[in-house]
Amino acid sequence: MRRLVIAGNWKMYKNNSEAVATLTELKNLTKDVNNVDIVIGAPFTCLSDAVKAVAGSNVKIAAENIYPKIEGAYTGEISPKMLKDIGVEYVILGHSERREYFKESDEFINQKVKAVLEIGMKPILCIGEKLEEREGGKTLEVLATQIKGGLADLSKEEAVKVIVAYEPVWAIGTGKTATPEMAQETHKEVRNVLAEMFGKEVADKIIIQYGGSMKPENAKDLLSQEDIDGGLVGGASLKADSFFEIIKAGN
C-alpha cells in the first residue's frame, strides 16, 4: 500500500517571516493528520527556519533545487550535503520551470537525482508534457523520455526512494486541470514505464504525485484514483488553510 505524499511547491514566493508564519499555522492545522506525508518546498532563504518551524510535526521540508556535487568551487550553488545538514529531507527536481528557463536536460537532472539519493535525501522528480505535445499525441513519448533520462542507472533499491510528480505543463498555473480520469490514465502509463525499467514489484511501490493545478475543489476526485499517490501543489499551497483542505481530502 503506497502512502500518500502531498507536497507544496512555493517557488519564488514568501520571505522568511511569511514562511515561518504559514508553516506554524500549517503545523497546528495538521497535528491530527496520520495517513498523509506532508512536504513543503520553500526557497533557500527560508529553509533553516522552516525546518525549525515544523519541528516535532508531520510536516517535512523540501528544497526546490540543488547542484549535483557534495562540495566544491561552484560559486552561487547549494549542495545536497548543505541542505541535509540543516534538516531538509526532500528536494524537488526537474520542474518544468527549471527545464524551460534554465535549460536543464534529463542528463543533468539525473545527476541531481543521484546526488540527492547519495546523501540520503528523497528526490521528487517532476515530469510533464506541454500542450502541443499532448495535442500531437506525444504525451507518453515525452514522459517516457523524461523518466528514463531522469532515473537512468539507478538500482531498484534507489528507484523506490524516488517520488515521481506528473505535472502536465499546460495545467500549471493556468487553472486548467486534467480530469481525474485523464490523470489516472497518464499515471498508469507512467507506472508502466517504471515497470519496464525496474520491474512491476518496484513500480508498484513508487509514489506518483499529480501536480497540475490541484486545489481543494478537485483534490478528492484526483486522490481517489488508483495510481495517484498524492499531489505536488503550487498556488493552493501558499495559504495554510487551502493546503490543509487538500491534505484533508487525502487523509
Where are the predicted features?
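Active-site loop-to-helix "anion-binding N-cap" substructures in soluble metabolic enzymes
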Residues: 1-251
